A protein has these predicted regions:
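Structural recognition of the beta-strand scaffold that forms the well-ordered cores
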Residues: 67-72, 89-92, 140-144, 161-164, ...
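N-terminal low-complexity, Pro/Thr/Ser-rich intrinsically disordered segments
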Residues: 35-57, 61-62
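A short, structured surface patch at a secondary-structure boundary
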Residues: 76-132, 140
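Bacterial signal peptide processing site
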Residues: 27-30
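Extracytoplasmic substrate-binding proteins
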Residues: 51, 150-222
């Protein structure tokens, strides 16, 4: 049983890493095919006049969204999963360092390294640089912030702040966040493909572990 649990731990961790790499790689300019589907659509529908974020905040939107900045843990990652990195015009300071630990950063580093820094991010926590954000003037801010932080930032910058949440690739709030990002950036079809891909991977893991008692299932930190 111990040997089985070790194998499952390694397998689950490997799947988590591979998922992150595959989902991000789909948005790169390489012609190499991957197992995850890639949408050929660049824009799916007309932008609504307002949107309700993960906290139930109703945020008024501009007529068009051609640019964004992403703040907080997971926000930029999910935008890259949605293949919306071309609309990013500012990044947090941590994105100016290339790292394999963040596949989306590693694959898009040549773009991110030259973008203005609009927040601290990383271990520095949620510290937006309001003046720099106003300078780059994005159409919308996508932020993995608390409701209070988002309200404060929106009041200071005058720019719509839509809150998303990233609690892991199999968390329901990530599905909701991807749907929000898809609507904001005109990537609904792509985001649906990503959600379906992750749900299929989750179901596969559940099928592989269904005969193991819950108290004997290994846990993985990713």
């Amino acid at each position: 049983m111990k040997h089985t649990r070790v194998k499952l731990t390694v397998f689950t961790l490997a799947v988590t890493i591979i998922l992150a790499m595959v989902l991000t790689a789909c948005g790169s300019e390489s012609g190499t095919q991957t197992n995850a589907p890639v949408s050929s659509s660049t824009s799916d529908s007309t932008l609504p006049t307002s949107i309700t974020d993960v906290y139930g905040r109703t945020v008024e939107l501009p007529e068009e969204i051609n640019s964004t900045v992403c703040l907080g843990a997971g926000a930029l990652r999910m935008v890259c999963y949605a293949q919306g990195e071309d609309k990013v015009i500012g990044v947090e300071e941590a994105e100016h360092q290339q790292t394999l630990a963040k596949a989306y950063n590693y694959l898009n580093y040549d773009k991110f390294k030259d973008l203005p820094i609009v927040g601290q991010g990383g271990s520095g926590g949620n510290t937006p640089y309001e003046e720099e954000i106003i300078k780059v003037n994005p159409d919308v801010i996508i932020a993995a912030y608390t409701q209070q932080e988002a309200d404060k930032l929106q009041a200071k910058t005058g720019i719509p702040v839509v809150c998303v949440a990233y609690d892991g690739i199999f968390d329901p709030t990530m599905d909701q966040s991807l749907e929000l990002i898809g609507t904001l950036l005109g990537k609904q079809e792509r985001c649906k493909e990503v959600i379906d891909f992750m749900q299929a991977a989750k179901q596969d893991l559940n099928n592989r572990t269904k005969d193991i008692p819950d108290d004997q299932k290994p846990t993985v930190f990713s």
